[in-house]
């Protein structure tokens, strides 16, 4: 069945998942539903401690068994130790058929591939998967389905009861013996625990895992003792030095700096750039650079930002230090400067639900003026792909990309015309993660394209000295340089789905075919005749 972005979703997947095809961003606007209530228990006159000796013992007390769903957050990014620690113990206990519901999985979790291959892990729900896990899923090694959700979509799935978490494991930099968790004050600080809040509120059992036990009460708690069943103290939960990795670092690349300048010039010439505007930037190097250049213009023109949202990095936190923004609203910290900034009284932590859940009574993303994002591919319909590489491998994460693009008044995507020798601006993206109706502007190193849906922006920019082109012109330039890319050859088996933030199916991910040389293909064809 064709969905609103023209992707054919097989009936078998619709039946298997019980989901509908994506029918546009506003299909569920005004929809009313009853949230799933969490399971809890009465604790009256307990011994005053929830401490359990180790991971094995807490798994026993939680009643771990085959077929359960366990959850994790990714606030430590590539420095996370908790997922591997817990899953190794589950594996060693001989437990099978586990579903992992993680806010994201990265290269730090490569050891999970062994557990995918032996059936310990059979289903994965995540914002994205990088490294060897993505390769394993794309190669068909996961027995069940990988469901990729946005940050807001994940909260929706948990709160609605679509995803029922049996045990939530929350790595927390500090915790007291009664379960009050904070993202700061320890030796492995990550800043906030926003992605874990929905898990803590809705999981049947909640386990706090810390390497810094502090005296009661550990206030103000990011996650309250009223949600936590058990506390386990381990040697290390993560390496905060690895929070800022890869895309989360500032760039010195001249091409990316040029795109950042184009982006900034577009922002400051748009009708939304005025005193009291709101802003979020992605984690890409060009996006971070655009924030730095924007700060200079804000100072020159005496324009103040009302609030910044994130995923936060040092340049956004510098705006707070320099008193150029009133407040920051934080769901994740991408570097240690952002972690430190959490201590600022005008730096507020918010939950992932407050940030981006489309199935509540209004999330922060709906109040954004600008969001600056990145993409692996953008097609001529402005659809974006941020999850599947041009080789067909799962290699990225939806994150808040679809959420912020849908909510912001002006969603700007920065992408180089070519990713290596592969056109990033193309006729059709490999996989749709963010629909073109959400994307207003695409900034490349060869020019800027405004979505024809946004005639107001086209009119506002008619006298601005920037290299404007149509998206088709950008595609044609890319193809003239590198040629039209050959489509990736996929097998028939569907190994994953790209879920829209509203829970419908945006696209599917198929198993990739092993590479074959042309001569080998010819020989196979001749033998089959």
Report the location of each language-model feature.
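Conserved alpha/beta enzyme-core scaffold
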Residues: 1-529
């Amino acid at each position: 069945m064709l969905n609103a972005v023209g992707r054919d979703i097989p009936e078998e997947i619709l039946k298997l998942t019980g989901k509908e095809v994506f029918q546009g961003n506003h299909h569920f606007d005004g929809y009313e539903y009853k949230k799933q209530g969490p399971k809890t228990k009465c604790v009256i006159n307990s011994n005053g401690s929830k401490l359990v000796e180790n991971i094995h013992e807490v798994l026993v007390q939680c009643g771990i068994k085959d077929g359960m769903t366990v959850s994790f957050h990714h606030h430590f990014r590539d420095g996370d130790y908790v997922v591997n620690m817990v899953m190794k113990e589950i594996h060693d206990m001989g437990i099978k058929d586990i579903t992992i519901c993680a806010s994201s999985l990265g290269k730090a979790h490569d050891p999970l591939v062994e557990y995918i291959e032996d059936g310990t892990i059979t289903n994965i729900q995540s914002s994205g998967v990088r490294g060897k896990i993505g390769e394993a899923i794309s190669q068909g090694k996961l027995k069940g389905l990988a469901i990729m959700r946005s940050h807001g979509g994940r909260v929706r799935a948990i709160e609605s009861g679509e995803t029922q978490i049996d045990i939530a494991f929350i790595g927390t930099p500090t915790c007291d013996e009664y379960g009050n968790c904070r993202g700061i004050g320890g030796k492995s600080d990550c800043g906030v625990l926003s992605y874990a809040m929905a898990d803590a509120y809705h999981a049947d059992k909640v386990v706090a895992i810390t390497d810094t036990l502090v005296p009661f009460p550990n206030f103000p708690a990011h996650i309250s003792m009223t949600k936590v069943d058990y506390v386990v103290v381990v040697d290390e939960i993560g390496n905060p030095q690895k929070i800022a990795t890869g895309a989360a670092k500032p760039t010195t690349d001249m091409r990316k700096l040029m795109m950042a300048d184009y982006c900034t010039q577009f922002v400051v010439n748009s009708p939304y750039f005025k005193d009291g505007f709101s802003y979020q930037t992605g984690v890409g190097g060009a996006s971070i650079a655009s924030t730095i250049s924007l700060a200079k213009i804000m100072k020159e023109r005496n324009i103040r930002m009302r609030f910044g949202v994130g995923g936060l990095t040092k340049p956004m936190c510098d705006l707070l230090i320099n008193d150029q923004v009133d407040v920051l609203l934080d769901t994740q910290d991408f570097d240690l400067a952002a972690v430190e900034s959490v201590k600022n009284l005008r730096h507020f932590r918010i939950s992932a639900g407050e940030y981006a859940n489309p199935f509540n009574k209004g999330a922060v993303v709906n109040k954004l003026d600008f969001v600056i994002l990145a993409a692996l591919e953008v097609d001529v319909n402005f659809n974006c792909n941020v999850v599947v590489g041009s080789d067909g491998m799962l290699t990225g994460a939806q994150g808040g990309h679809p959420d912020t693009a849908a909510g912001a008044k002006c969603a700007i995507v920065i992408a180089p015309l070519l990713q290596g020798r592969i056109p990033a601006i193309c006729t059709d993206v490999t996989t749709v993660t963010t629909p073109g109706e959400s994307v207003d502007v695409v900034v490349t190193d060869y020019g800027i394209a405004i979505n024809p849906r946004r005639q107001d922006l086209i009119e506002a920019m008619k006298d601005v000295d920037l290299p404007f082109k149509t998206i088709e012109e950008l595609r044609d330039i890319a193809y003239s340089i590198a040629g039209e890319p050959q489509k990736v050859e996929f097998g028939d088996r569907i190994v994953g789905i790209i879920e829209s933030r509203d829970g419908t199916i945006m696209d599917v991910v198929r198993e990739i075919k092993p590479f074959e040389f042309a001569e080998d293909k010819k020989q196979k064809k001749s033998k089959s005749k």
